[in-house]
Amino acid sequence: MSAILSADDLNDFISPGVACIKPVETLPAKSERDESAYEVTTEDKVAAENPSPAQISLTDCLACSGCVTSAEAVLISLQSHAEVLNTLDAYPELRVDGFRNGVQNGATGDARIFVASVSPQVRASMAATYGVSEKEAGYMIEQFLSGPQGLRAGGQHGSGFTWVVDTNVIRDVVLELTTDEVTASRAKFDSTATSESAEFPIPRQPILSSACPGWICYAEKTHPHVLPHLSRLKSPQALTGTFIKTILSKRLNVPPSRIWHLAIMPCFDKKLEASRQELTDASWQTTNHDIFASPAMDQPIRDVDCVITSRELLMLASSRNISLLTLPLTPLPSSFTTPFPDPRIAQFLFPKHHASNQSVSSGPSGGYLHHLLTTHQALHPNSTIQAQRGRNADVIDYTLVSAETGRPIIKAARYYGFRNIQNLVRKLKPAKTSRLPGARAAVSRRTGISASHTAAGGGVSDYAYIEVMACPGGCTNGGGQIRVEDARDTATIATSSIDGSAPTAQTSQHKPTPQEQRAWLARVDEVYYSADSDSHPPSSPSTSLGDEMEIDRPLEPESRSQSVHAILQYWSDMTGIPLPKLVYTTFRKVESDVGKSKNGAADTARVAELAGKIGGGW
């Protein structure tokens, strides 16, 4: 979610406790007395009865339809920089130098392979904080996670991360698959709907992006009517986890449970995404592949084991007393890089050149919409992309117009922020049909707008794709990004550590003004967009393999598309898993179990009694 909806700014951000609605399932306790007896209860007695604290599990929170923000409190406690440190201290690093040609060479015990993935928005936030370029920020993070002066310098086992992956690489895969998905949906637009029994049905138009977990959580809990429109593609974070775990499991002959994947993301809601049951090895596991089996594991293994944010990355460094600014802003030495076990995958994951596609026109959230439009524009020479701003800067309509006919070729839109998302879901809400036979279609209160128009999506039915993000301003404004006050404190501490002076405590006392916050976001955006000319790969571990093809310049769009589809086919063939199981996911309507007993019957009386005791009611 956005910084505006973070825990520090919302007074309805509740930790699991008596305020959570889950106690409705167990409270009030049934009296042991005879139910036929009458009892007079005074108000004083009711007020004195304190409800027991709720025992909320992560599954409860994700299956709850009461709120969105309280789930983050659970996830923050379960996925944090402390979990990273505890895991590194609990398990020694499994050195993969002894693995050759997919044969395990004496790896025993509880050792783990540690892999990290970093989003470009995190690098932009770090770069703006420390006054370095986006490329240097990437090197700083890599040195911290994998270098000799970073995490490996401390801890019980001196464990660090064997590989650090740029999620931009996997994002390119999602961009290409998004274009394919929209093309398939448009082809089905006038035909019969896909069978509901299909595991991954083609979404209805307009397709809504599904990479933002805050938006997905909101849709599943409150607007299930939009679920058929959601893109079935995994997000770059989720797809990176699947990609890493399936390939390393296959090539190194280790179960997914021994591969620990950390994702560093710009928002807290990515923790929600990593905790989804649909994003575990159970979704792609096949019965005839014992190599993927996780012995003695009762629970499915997550594709992403832990998610931390930009701010938590600073906390991770602080916990180990590591000054990030003192780390080398250069690639890792070759002596500290480990060859990836598959040369072809290594060439793809760690390219010598990579076009970041982080321009102003592509936006701050991955460029899904921009890639779709430019791909179709390349198929229609001389066509033009027209943009029209909506009610605010976070709503923009795009139309690709034919040069010959002047007619629209494809229409798309961008909706950022929950205020705009609410307007969007209202447009997609189907019209209420009368239960009376032969009744005429209802007419909207607004003159001239029929129910058929509302059912068609209120003006968005002819859109092919809509990029939806919960954060106003997009992903660079994620709630986990480094705030302007944190950046001031970090800069003060960094300066004092360099010149030896004592840090002052004045900076934290000054609350930033809205103008300062906007200026800070603009600075982060500027760094993010500058990465297009400052593109870099992580320290390539594939150089020592000697099998990679040299690429002197970035691939052209058509060649990039062919390269992506080729690597996807190679991935599926290598693992023996159908490609849809690897790249697609599913969404479901979250139904509240409030007021329902275990046998499914409603228990309205108990709910009403509890509501009265806590001062509420229906």
UniProtKB/Swiss-Prot annotation:
PANTHER family per the UniProt record, alphabetical: NITRATE, FORMATE, IRON DEHYDROGENASE
Molecular functions (GO terms): 4 iron, 4 sulfur cluster binding; iron-sulfur cluster binding; metal ion binding
Pfam families with a match to the protein in the record: Fe_hyd_lg_C (PF02906)
Binding site for [4Fe-4S] cluster 2: C212, C267, C471, C475
Keyword match Metal-binding: yes
Superkingdom of the source species: Eukaryota
Gene that specifies this protein: NAR1
GO biological process: iron-sulfur cluster assembly
Region (Disordered): 495-516, 530-560
Chain residues that bind [4Fe-4S] cluster 1: C20, C61, C64, C67
Function, as annotated: Component of the cytosolic Fe/S protein assembly machinery. Required for maturation of extramitochondrial Fe/S proteins. May play a role in the transfer of pre-assembled Fe/S clusters to target apoproteins.
Keyword Lipid metabolism: no
Family note: Belongs to the NARF family.
UniProt cross-references to InterPro entries, sorted A to Z: Cytosolic_Fe-S_CAF, Fe_hydrogenase, Fe_hydrogenase_lsu_C
SUPFAM superfamilies (UniProt xref): Fe-only hydrogenase
UniProt keyword terms in alphabetical order: 4Fe-4S, Iron, Iron-sulfur, Metal-binding
Protein name: Cytosolic Fe-S cluster assembly factor NAR1
